């Protein structure tokens, strides 16, 4: 037993010197030609599978593609590019890192105004909703560092309520348009109308992110009862000519003791920390810097913007153009003629240095299991769809194929 223990210690000591060479990555390194061949075959199978085709359709000889079909193809492609651009501009940092670092907290109180400015009389009788407006323009420059946003409002008891419980729903107010609804649903709650006061919280991260990206979209939030303009019997039937009113009361909005005090009452409201407010959790940029690089350099994203301009040896997205005719032998895809499918490649160094016990154990594991991957591998993180125009017989089709373009990579 003692001899086996001594042998194990000797092996671990020797592996201390070998860990440096083993700690880059155990993922198999392939040459470009082999990678392209594998990627081409994968794309061939992906496209046919996504189109539910067992074999490529017969190519159709077309002298020209109708304008309407080309317009549909171009508009679809542009819409996808726009959506990806907005997602990139408004996205947060990678989740694991953003969860780890401490957040700066910003509080924005509801903008106070006259009573009628915080009410929407949607129905002929009664008050069915409340509006809450906020100015968050001071943090617009740090919009990409938004981690989470919460809307908080204090429900206060309503002793004169005619019901014990009522359902409320929170909406983002949208700019009026005849083609879309004027509200976007965020969440709902069933609440007691009496009882003790309680704070209500709603996750409004996506809404606030949109406000920070486009200031003109900030039209406020609205709390409304579930079915305004109707009151229901216990069996679900509508009571005609009787309209439900909001009996849930909120601090800072329904304070009857402040009514009639004019500017003095509104000033008191502004200083009341129980008023409706937003809580924004922001990650300071310096906390996302790479601590190992002496300067204040922002951690780079391993995407096409960085990788295509730099000679990065470690994990990065690499350009790979697929020509439908030359690489796949396909003539049935009319648009595009080809596209950058890209791929991920490069070693992923361990997070810990090579002289730690952690790396030593992993090095031993790699030695005993050469086919396994104990260290991270370079894999796709963000993928974009591809829009194609093709014919089945003489019928044109425009299709969107999901996850066809590698835009960024990560070590996983």
Swiss-Prot record:
The keyword Kinase does not apply. Interacts with ASPN. Latency-associated peptide: Homodimer; disulfide-linked. Latency-associated peptide: Interacts with Transforming growth factor beta-3 (TGF-beta-3) chain; interaction is non-covalent and maintains (TGF-beta-3) in a latent state. Latency-associated peptide: Interacts with LRRC32/GARP; leading to regulate activation of TGF-beta-3 and promote epithelial fusion during palate development. Latency-associated peptide: Interacts (via cell attachment site) with integrins, leading to release of the active TGF-beta-3. Transforming growth factor beta-3: Homodimer; disulfide-linked. A motif (Cell attachment site) lies at residues 261-263. It comes from Homo sapiens. Residues 1-23 form the signal peptide. This is Transforming growth factor beta-3 proprotein. Transforming growth factor beta-3 proprotein: Precursor of the Latency-associated peptide (LAP) and Transforming growth factor beta-3 (TGF-beta-3) chains, which constitute the regulatory and active subunit of TGF-beta-3, respectively. Transforming growth factor beta-3: Multifunctional protein that regulates embryogenesis and cell differentiation and is required in various processes such as secondary palate development. Activation into mature form follows different steps: following cleavage of the proprotein in the Golgi apparatus, Latency-associated peptide (LAP) and Transforming growth factor beta-3 (TGF-beta-3) chains remain non-covalently linked rendering TGF-beta-3 inactive during storage in extracellular matrix. The keyword Disulfide bond applies. Glycans are attached at residues 74, 135, 142. It is linked to Arrhythmogenic right ventricular dysplasia, familial, 1: A congenital heart disease characterized by infiltration of adipose and fibrous tissue into the right ventricle and loss of myocardial cells, resulting in ventricular and supraventricular arrhythmias. One of its GO terms (molecular function) is identical protein binding. The modification N5-methylglutamine is found at residue 293. Belongs to the TGF-beta family. Keywords: Cardiomyopathy, Cleavage on pair of basic residues, Disease variant, Disulfide bond, Extracellular matrix, Glycoprotein, Growth factor, Methylation, Mitogen, Secreted, Signal. Disulfide bonds join 307-316, 315-378, 344-409, 348-411. SUPFAM superfamilies: Cystine-knot cytokines (SSF57501). GO terms for cellular component: collagen-containing extracellular matrix; extracellular region; extracellular space; intracellular membrane-bounded organelle; plasma membrane; platelet alpha granule lumen. InterPro entries: Cystine-knot_cytokine, TGF-b_C, TGF-b_propeptide, TGF-beta, TGF-beta-rel, TGFB3, TGFb_CS. Transforming growth factor beta-3 proprotein: The precursor proprotein is cleaved in the Golgi apparatus to form Transforming growth factor beta-3 (TGF-beta-3) and Latency-associated peptide (LAP) chains, which remain non-covalently linked, rendering TGF-beta-3 inactive. Methylated at Gln-293 by N6AMT1.
